Every structure is written in structure tokens, then in C-alpha cells.
């Protein structure tokens, strides 16, 4: 009779030898609605579940598609209703307190921390420093640790040191491919750091028109690397309202 393999010793051995090793499954336990039943179902096959904690979600689309409204409005409001603390990183300098409050977002310091930054390196350092302190405080009690959601609006406006240096020198030659690599590294590290904790990230990004006549769909800026690294990517676009027989614009399907 074949003996059953006992993985107890092996599990203890690799746990001691590999720092930060995760064993077992880390399925999401907390979900935040996007405020749109159709979008929730598209993302998770559940009308009430949208953004999962422990994952990285990207909403990409053209200007006016509603990315900021959903990410910085609906999702933050619904997260706060669930007792989740939100860290909002504004890279576009476009999120006004009055606009957020009009969307029923609680802007008090005990519910929301708003940070304004423009460098992708600064965003990475901010997330890294937060995770170091978070892990030190809650390493022994992951289930009882506070729930946190990062919102970045948007990835497309982030700059690299190369962008800044060239602007100051008056030489606009592009970032030489550094930004796609930096965004990929940012998303990949966030996915790895958040997996075992009740921490999530939702970010918006821009799209641009495709130059390929055989592939006319809009392309997401920042390269393909971070798209594959993200847990969920939603491509959005804006459509005109339909008109009824009397010429009135309607939003019904």
C-alpha cells in the first residue's frame, strides 16, 4: 500500500528558509461594488461584487468614459460604507474636495487620505513604506487587520525622472521606454504585496486610438506588461445616449 506523503516537515522547512512565503489559498473575502450592476457582473459574474481586496484592478478608457467617476466616486464611497480606509493618490491634480463630497465621499481625515504626486517612483515608495509598517503591525493578526484601498487616478499621468530631466533641459525625447517598465514593476509588486492582506488597489489609465487597421480597438497606454500583471483590467468607452420616437435622450437599454 502506498504511503501518504506528509508535507508537514517540508512546509516548516520552506517557511523558515523563504521569507515572506505564502502557503495555501488567498481568495478575496471583501468586494467593493462599482455602483453599476452591469459592470459588477462583467467583472465578477456577481451583481453585487466589483473590486476585490487583495488584488489590483485597472479601469482604462478614453476621456469622459467615467473612469474617475467610478474609481474616485462610487468605489471610494462604497468602500467607506464598508469600513474600508481609502488612500487616494491624485496624479492629475483634478480631484476637488467639493466634487468628491457631491458624490457622497467622506473627505474627513479618519476616512480618506488624499495624496498628490506625479512621479511613478514616489507612488512606488509610498506603497512600499505603507506595506512595511502595515506588515510589522499586523503580521500576527492578518484577519483582524484594518482594510485599506489604494486608488490611483491615474497611471497615465505619472512621470518618470527621465521625463522631468528632459523637460528641465528643454529636450523632449521621451522616456526611452522607462515608464512602461516602471508601471509593470509597480503593479507586479503591488500584486505580490497585497495578496495575503485585506488591501486592494484600483487605478485608472488612459487609452489612445489604434494605428492598426486590422486591430481598431483602442490601446491602453503604458505598455502591455502591467496589463498582464494586473488582476482585473476593464476597457471602457463613452457612448451617446439613444433617442426615443419623440427625440428625447434616454438611458434605457
PLM-predicted stretches and their roles:
Residues 2-110, 123-132:
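The Walker A/P-loop phosphate-binding site
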Residues 32-36, 53, 68-69, 116-128, ...:
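Amphipathic alpha-helical transducer elements in NTP-driven molecular machines
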Residues 39, 100, 153, 205, ...:
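Residue-level signature of catalytic and energy-coupling elements of molecular machines
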Residues 48-49, 84, 136-141, 195, ...:
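Active-site phosphate-binding and catalytic loops of NTP-dependent enzymes
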Residues 50-57, 142-150, 175-179, 221, ...:
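Glycine-rich, flexible loop segments associated with nucleotide phosphate handling
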Residues 55-57, 85-87, 148-150, 200-202, ...:
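Structural motif
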Residues 62, 74, 78, 82-185, ...:
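Conserved inter-motif catalytic segment of the P-loop NTP-binding fold
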Residues 176-253:
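Phosphate-binding/switch region of NTP-binding enzymes
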